[in-house]
């Protein structure tokens, strides 16, 4: 499964998010972009959860980390949230030696005074991938039942 396929399907799922007239995000689990093994996005009780990997697996670690942070921005925008709404980010690096690059880009990206809970571990990722992030964020009020 390519990162491009994932992004395309995630975008389609997020478009559906805005088209649903009966929004029950507070009481029902909402799954978007479902496959047999996973959903691209899940929203429950005002919290969205999803995973990001770089669209371009040919980029180096710096390029992939920058891509993933940018992709998080895009998903947050689509669910009407912001980086200040991030609750938790779990980061998997193929090589912990890249953590200095991660920290440099992360410190520029995270809004001052609003860091989410964060963990960073080394993991054996799919070939060509340097980083994978699991994100949770509060969903904007207008995307929830009142």
What is each of the regions a protein language model found here?
Residues 11-87, 93-146:
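N-terminal presequence-like segments and the immediate start of the first folded domain
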């Amino acid at each position: 499964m390519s990162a491009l396929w994932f992004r395309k399907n995630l975008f389609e799922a997020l478009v559906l998010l805005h088209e649903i007239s009966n929004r029950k995000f507070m009481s029902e689990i909402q799954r978007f972009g479902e496959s047999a093994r996973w959903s691209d996005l899940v929203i429950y009780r005002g919290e969205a959860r999803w995973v990001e990997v770089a669209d371009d697996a040919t980029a180096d670690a710096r390029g992939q980390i920058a891509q993933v942070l940018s992709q998080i921005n895009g998903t947050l925008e689509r669910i009407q949230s912001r980086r200040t709404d991030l609750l938790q980010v779990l980061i998997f690096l193929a090589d912990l030696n890249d953590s200095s690059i991660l920290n440099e880009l992360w410190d520029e990206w995270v809004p001052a005074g609003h860091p989410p809970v964060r963990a960073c571990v080394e993991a054996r990722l799919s070939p060509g991938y340097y980083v994978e992030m699991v994100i949770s964020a509060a969903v904007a009020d207008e995307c929830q039942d009142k």
